[in-house]
Amino acid sequence: FTAEVEDSRIVMGQGDYTVGPTGYNVGENSVIADPEPTEVDKAFLQYKNEGLTLKAGRQVIALDNHRFIGHVGWRQDRQTFDGVSAKYVVSENVDVFYAYLNQRNRIFAEAADFDSKDHLINANFKTKMGKFTAYAYLLEVDNDTANGLDTYGIRYSGSYKTQSVGWGYGAEYASQTSESGSGDTATEYD
């Protein structure tokens, strides 16, 4: 069992700022998206056996470059997720990750968390030339409305060293579709 609690608050000075979606000082001051929360950051049960890791509870999930799924770790209240996850390391070069999430604990503290029905799938294959990743992130806020945001993508990244310089390279393509009460939209990223 692992647990971690966090507390962020003003020690000196005043609270002359606004925390966007939490409703704190709305419209009165500049937005600083760092509320003063005291909350459980992580609390999960974990099972590990050879290549399999299972977690159930509140956990940090950061996939690939954090572009679509990450903890937003530069904020005072990092993003965590409630749910179950499984990572299976098939071999030294292949691993697969799956998570079902029923809550996104966002950076704005508990007042702005989302109940959700999210599925995260991420698979990696490492070669001498680099790492190939395929993913599907199927996000849905659990509020009885059509609001799905589905992201499907592939990513390739690697590095190369010369005698004096290290080089990193990467390419990514993702397609995103959104289903909401106002209609369907689609976007592509590369």
Report residues per predicted region.
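Beta-barrel outer-membrane channel/assembly domains of diderm bacteria
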Residues: 1-61, 84-90, 94, 154-170, ...
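Short Asp/Glu-rich motifs
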Residues: 12-13, 65, 144
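Outer-membrane beta-barrel and related beta-rich outer-membrane complex signature
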Residues: 13-17, 68, 110, 183
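A short linear-motif detector with a strong N-terminal bias
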Residues: 24, 33-34, 63-66, 75, ...
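Extracytoplasmic loops and strand-loop junctions of Gram-negative outer membrane beta-barrel proteins
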Residues: 24-29, 66-69, 105-107
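Short acidic (Asp/Glu) patches
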Residues: 39, 69, 80
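Signature for the C-terminal beta-barrel architecture of outer-membrane proteins
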Residues: 50-54, 72-190
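"Short basic amphipathic alpha-helical interaction patches in structured regions
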Residues: 59, 69-74
